A protein has these predicted regions:
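Intracellular juxtamembrane helix-capping segments at the cytosolic ends
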Residues: 13-26, 246-260
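A late C-terminal transmembrane helix in Major Facilitator Superfamily
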Residues: 262-292
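Loop-to-transmembrane helix entry/capping segments in MFS-fold secondary transporters
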Residues: 28-38, 176, 259-271
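C-terminal ends and interior cores of transmembrane alpha-helices
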Residues: 1, 216-228
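Loop-to-transmembrane helix entry
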Residues: 36, 163-188, 300-303
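Helix-to-loop junctions at the C-terminal end of transmembrane segments
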Residues: 192-206, 290
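Intracellular loop-helix junctions on the cytosolic face of multi-pass helical membrane proteins
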Residues: 2-5, 13-14, 18-19, 25-148, ...
Length: 347
């Protein structure tokens, strides 16, 4: 489990610069489209990944002496090639914005300071805007919940749809294969709704879009483990697909409005910590919760994840949403959501 967490943490670390890159490359009025375009491609990629599990199971039969199916090796190898390949394409083909003379002088002054980056991170945490601290609570609930879902959804489908809890049986392998299709389906929903969330966020505010999306997932995950038909389980998982589109895009729309543009990089790294730490916490603690509180029942694990997403929605209500478009670096905590056009002077 710890190695899987390390793999996920490494993947998140590799993806972190892209979020800062979106904020750097796009004008304030287009950052929402940028982050939700990221949601679109994330959903499309995960859909293809989940479908590939189903394909690999039909192409690669047999298993190792340790009981690990060969299709698992094939899936990990394909994932490695795609991860390294796409990062290389982005690094080699996307020009980076050169630093200004002032920024260059500042970087050169810090060159001999080995602890400079750590000091900068520590200072950024100390000076973190209040609303971003509140967003950390939302991240705690939603990423703990998502890790619960990913770890126990196969067990839930195996128990409630295929009628098995024997993880070494052929029936359970069929359940894992079907779970890949279920996960592929919720990611189809993710890339289908991603761009519509942009319009909703501009019209209603990113805060309320994220709250509604999380509540859709709450309802879906509470219902999901109580359905025994393999085709009907695709219906409640639509809610999770909507929430996933929001989780990987909408909070970043708010976050870039909470911090100065000169510190996008360091704060995107801190937001990445807000993802990784809850997942590590879940890895270390949920085993005890699953055994002593949830009775080793994957049905309860799914419902528990749904409740946590509901708590994330409640925590989101505590946040004051920043301006919808901002063209200055100074950050304030406005009492209400408002739209500020670039170049407009507020009275």
């Amino acid at each position: 489990a710890l190695l899987l967490w390390l793999l996920d943490a490494s993947n998140n670390t590799a993806m972190e610069p892209y979020r800062a890159f979106i904020a750097d490359k796009l004008p304030p009025s287009q950052t929402g489209k940028g982050f939700l375009a990221q949601s679109f491609f994330a959903g499309l990629g995960i859909t293809l990944a989940n479908v590939s599990l189903y394909v690999f199971q039909t192409l690669l039969s047999g298993m190792t002496s340790a009981g690990i199916p060969y299709w698992v090796f094939g899936s990990f190898m394909l994932g490695s090639v795609c991860s390294i390949g796409t990062v290389l394409v982005s690094v080699l083909r996307t020009p980076e914005i050169p630093p200004s003379p002032e920024e260059l002088a500042r970087l050169r002054a810090k060159k001999g300071d080995s602890f400079g980056p750590l000091r900068e991170i520590g200072l950024a945490i100390i000076e973190m805007p209040v609303q971003l601290r509140k967003l950390a609570l939302v991240y705690l609930f939603q990423w703990y919940a998502m890790n619960c879902y990913w770890q126990y959804v196969s067990l839930s489908v195996g128990k409630n749809v295929f009628g098995t809890t024997d993880t070494k049986s052929a029936t359970y392998e069929s359940a894992v294969s079907w779970t890949g299709l279920v996960n592929g389906w919720y990611n189809v929903i993710t890339f289908s709704v991603a761009f519509s969330l942009v319009a909703l966020a501009r019209r209603r505010g990113a805060k309320w879009v994220h709250i509604c999306a999380l509540l859709c997932a709450t309802v879906g995950l509470v219902i999901f483990p109580h359905i025994g038909n393999r085709f009907l389980i695709f219906l409640p998982i639509v809610g999770l697909g909507i929430a996933w589109a929001s989780i990987v895009g909408v909070p970043y729309i708010m976050a870039v409005r909470m911090v100065p543009s000169s510190r996008y990089g360091v704060y995107m790294g801190i937001i990445n910590m807000m993802i990784v730490i809850p997942m590590l916490l879940q890895t270390l603690t949920f085993g005890l919760v699953y055994k002593h509180l949830l009775g080793n029942n994957p049905t309860n694990a799914m419902m528990f994840a749904g409740v946590l997403l509901g708590l994330a929605a409640l925590a989101m209500m505590w946040i004051k949403e920043p301006p919808i478009v901002r063209d200055v670096d100074e950050v304030s905590d406005p009492p209400n959501v408002r739209t500020v056009r670039v170049g407009e002077v507020e009275s």
